[in-house]
């Protein structure tokens, strides 16, 4: 299906371009979200008549996004979550959680603007891209920790998930002897 793009769409094209896409993608995403029009003769004429307005509106949105990007780029946000000793979270951190934390800090960012391929499931520092506008993208750092003290340690570069290394002999167990005893017991039964 041919559509006319009303704004820049990543990996597809710039505003005003006529592109050929699959019908489902056009109907369910591009047309539904107002990012494109069907490429009919009437729509082409309508688009050309309104092109200046659309470009002005796009430029205004990009400038607003650029202003927010200057303040947001490189910022670090702390999320406190419960996790096991190995650093694996009970649950995960999704775009909704990220949007809440960033909004509490005074930035206007929606959950759909965060680019996460999969939810975050471990403690530590994670760099997350934020697409404020199709032409403006910044990166923020999310510090996921079990407590504010741990977050400070992680920010300094310390690992909070180091497991203590131990040897079975240090525990007072004689592995060889335990196996030998188990083997003798098996002979007595049979």
From Swiss-Prot:
The gene is rplI. It comes from Methylorubrum extorquens (strain PA1) (Methylobacterium extorquens). The keyword Magnesium does not apply. Belongs to the bacterial ribosomal protein bL9 family. It comes from the Bacteria. GO terms for biological process: translation. GO terms for cellular component: ribonucleoprotein complex; ribosome. This is Large ribosomal subunit protein bL9. Binds to the 23S rRNA. GO terms for molecular function: rRNA binding; structural constituent of ribosome. The keyword Cell membrane does not apply. It holds the Pfam family Ribosomal_L9_C. Keywords: Ribonucleoprotein, Ribosomal protein, RNA-binding, rRNA-binding.
């Amino acid at each position: 299906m041919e559509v006319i793009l009303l704004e820049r769409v990543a990996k597809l094209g710039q505003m005003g371009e006529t592109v050929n896409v699959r019908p489902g993608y056009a109907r369910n995403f591009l047309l539904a979200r107002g990012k494109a029009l069907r490429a009919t003769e009437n729509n082409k004429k309508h688009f050309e008549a309104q092109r200046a307005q659309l470009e002005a509106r796009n430029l205004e949105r990009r400038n607003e996004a650029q202003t927010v990007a200057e303040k947001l780029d490189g910022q670090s946000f702390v999320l406190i979550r419960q996790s096991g000793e190995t650093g694996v979270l009970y649950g995960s951190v999704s775009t909704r959680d990220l949007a809440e934390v960033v909004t509490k800090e005074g930035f206007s960012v929606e959950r759909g603007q965060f680019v996460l391929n999969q939810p975050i499931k471990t403690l530590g520092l994670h760099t997350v891209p934020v697409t404020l506008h199709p032409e403006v993208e910044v990166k923020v750092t999310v510090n996921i920790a079990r407590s504010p003290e741990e977050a400070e340690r992680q920010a300094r570069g310390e690992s909070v998930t180091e497991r203590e290394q131990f040897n079975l002999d240090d525990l007072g167990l004689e592995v060889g002897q335990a196996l030998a005893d188990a083997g003798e017991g098996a002979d007595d039964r049979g």
